[in-house]
A protein has these predicted regions:
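A short, N-terminal "cap"/entry segment at the start of jelly-roll beta-barrel domains
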Residues: 1-38, 81
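Beta-sandwich/jelly-roll carbohydrate-recognition scaffolds of carbohydrate-active enzymes
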Residues: 33-37, 59, 71-73, 89-90
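Conserved short histidine dyad/triad with adjacent acidic residue
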Residues: 39-55, 99
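Histidine-centered metal-chelating micro-motifs
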Residues: 49, 95, 100-111, 129
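Short, conserved beta-strand element in jelly-roll/cupin
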Residues: 55-70
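Short acidic-glycine-tyrosine-enriched beta hairpin
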Residues: 72-105
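A short hydrophobic beta-strand segment most commonly corresponding to one strand
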Residues: 112-131
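Mixed-charge, glycine-accented linear interaction segment located at domain edges/termini
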Residues: 136, 142-152, 158
């Protein structure tokens, strides 16, 4: 069956650009420009780096195999982010999130400490905004930073 989607496959690499992070098969449209949604099959290979991020579109997922811990913001009474908390989502879980919802994913591990891939059916809505990360800033707390700036700054940090 995967041969049916071989020309609809995209491998997304981790933030360093070196390690395959996610394999995405486009079930519906591979190249959508103005269509309001898309449906893909995801195989998550490694955990996100442990930094809260949002997405450019609202999204939904149904976990088919495996699962993950989803880390979401822990907020102070005033509403600002002070850390994160986590919840397990396993096979059969169906969830929907807004583009502004922050999270990061942590895959389960086997007895040898290797991450167990997670398969999910994924829905992404129309692009609503740019996406980014919550960055911890000394003496300030957390602030949202655009993904391009975050990734550029991160590459500089990796070289030092």
């Amino acid at each position: 069956m995967m041969d049916l989607f071989k020309n609809r496959k995209r491998t997304i690499y981790d933030r360093t650009g070196k390690i395959p992070y996610l394999v995405r098969w486009y079930i519906f449209l591979k190249d959508r420009k103005s269509f309001p949604f898309n449906v893909t099959l995801h195989k998550i290979l490694v955990s996100d780096e442990p930094v809260l991020h949002d997405h450019p579109w609202s999204w939904g997922t149904m976990i088919l195999k495996g699962g993950y811990w989803e880390h979401t913001p822990l907020r102070a009474e005033e509403g600002h982010v002070v850390g994160s908390t986590k919840k397990w989502w396993g096979p059969g879980t169906v969830r929907f999130r807004k583009a502004d919802d922050l999270h990061w994913l942590e895959l389960a591990k086997d007895k040898d400490g290797n991450e167990i891939p997670c398969w999910s059916l994924f829905y992404m809505g129309k692009k609503a905004k740019d996406w980014g990360f919550m960055q911890q800033v000394k003496d300030i707390g957390y602030r949202w930073i655009h993904n391009e700036k975050y990734l550029k700054d991160r590459k500089v940090d990796e070289r030092t």
